[in-house]
């Protein structure tokens, strides 16, 4: 694990629709070791390594969940709307960063009423999104605007990046900066002259998998590996039958989500790779969400796709948690798969006539 790269990516502010900071990091990281960097019309990052053989894409979405400024009141408080999926109880009194249209960063906090000022009835009622506000310490609308805040500015969560103990990493936007970091590490280390390897940082995944569709049309890959996160069910309050993934027990192979089924031959090959390398592998399903695989698998008449996810605690909140061991196991698994891939193997993924 390149922990320095992951920290740099997690600390970037890159809400859906405003992914430039992550895009810049990927450009600076990968430009020295790839043949070409291009972008689709929405801004998805596409790096190409090699120029012969089947096109194999490794995809991690760049965007994170966040907010957008929708109103500045007379007292300088900001009203906002959510971008991506949020639970209102995970938001109050958390720090945020407003990224202005000119690229300046302004700190803020989602305000909350002190318990002393709440009635017993109010204490039992969750605050709705519409009642929340962000305090940037401004005394008036004029002061907020003078600092550069405008309607339409993007807002990202704010949290410290840290390593806890020997194995855990805690930070914001692990969904899905881990996919971006791993994609970059694979582009740096995999050298297979039999394939053309693409690294994709897709945009706007959290609001409808949009960059997956546009980047798929841009590349027209022959096989795709989607890297993402998935709910870890190893904490109190989560149904661990519906959400069986556990930190430290290996990466998860997504058997289906709301928009995708994996190519079963691709699944079999990855299972064999894991067994051959003595790597742990878990399995999960997701009925209420989707990964970029849901757009890639229906591109151009259909393509073989598989989504591999890191178990992650506290998704879509200020601070998530992953296991270094899970990350390293997934990196080893995909590196082995990509290094041994040939045109014959890629073609076999799409052969559906049974042979006696």
Question: Positions of the model-derived regions?
Answer:
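N-terminal hydrophobic/helix-forming segments and targeting peptides
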Residues: 1-356
């Amino acid at each position: 694990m390149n922990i320095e790269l992951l920290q740099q990516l997690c600390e970037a502010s890159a809400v859906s629709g405003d992914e430039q900071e992550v895009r810049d990091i990927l450009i600076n990281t990968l430009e020295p070791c790839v043949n070409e960097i291009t972008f689709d019309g929405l801004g998805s990052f596409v790096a190409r390594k090699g120029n012969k053989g089947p096109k194999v894409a490794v995809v991690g979405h760049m965007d994170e969940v966040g907010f957008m400024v929708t109103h500045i009141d007379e007292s300088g408080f900001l009203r906002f709307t959510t971008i991506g999926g949020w639970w209102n109880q995970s938001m109050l009194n958390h720090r945020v960063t407003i990224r202005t249209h000119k690229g300046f960063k302004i700190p803020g906090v989602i305000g909350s009423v002190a318990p002393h000022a709440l009635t017993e009835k109010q204490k039992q009622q969750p605050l709705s999104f519409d009642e929340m506000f962000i305090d940037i310490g401004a005394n008036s609308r004029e002061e907020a605007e003078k600092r550069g805040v405008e309607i339409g500015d993007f807002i990202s969560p704010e949290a410290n990046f840290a390593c806890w103990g020997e194995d855990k990493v805690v930070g914001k936007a692990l969904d899905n900066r881990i996919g971006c970091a791993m994609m970059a590490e694979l582009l740096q280390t995999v050298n297979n002259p039999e394939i053309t390897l693409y690294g994709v940082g897709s945009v706007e995944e959290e609001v409808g998998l949009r960059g997956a569709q546009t980047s798929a049309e841009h590349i027209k890959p022959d096989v795709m590996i989607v890297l993402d996160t998935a709910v870890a069910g190893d904490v109190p309050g989560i149904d661990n039958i519906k959400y069986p993934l556990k930190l430290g027990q290996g990466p998860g192979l997504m058997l289906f989500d709301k928009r995708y089924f994996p190519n079963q031959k691709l699944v079999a090959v990855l299972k064999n790779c894991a067994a051959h390398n003595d790597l742990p592998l878990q399995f999960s399903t997701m009925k209420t969400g989707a990964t970029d695989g849901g757009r890639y698998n229906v591109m151009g008449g259909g393509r073989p796709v598989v989504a591999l996810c890191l178990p992650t605690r506290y998704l879509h909140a200020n601070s998530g948690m992953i296991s270094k061991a899970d990350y390293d196991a997934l990196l080893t698994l995909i590196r082995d798969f990509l290094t041994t891939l040939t045109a014959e193997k890629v073609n076999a993924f799409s052969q559906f006539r049974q042979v006696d």
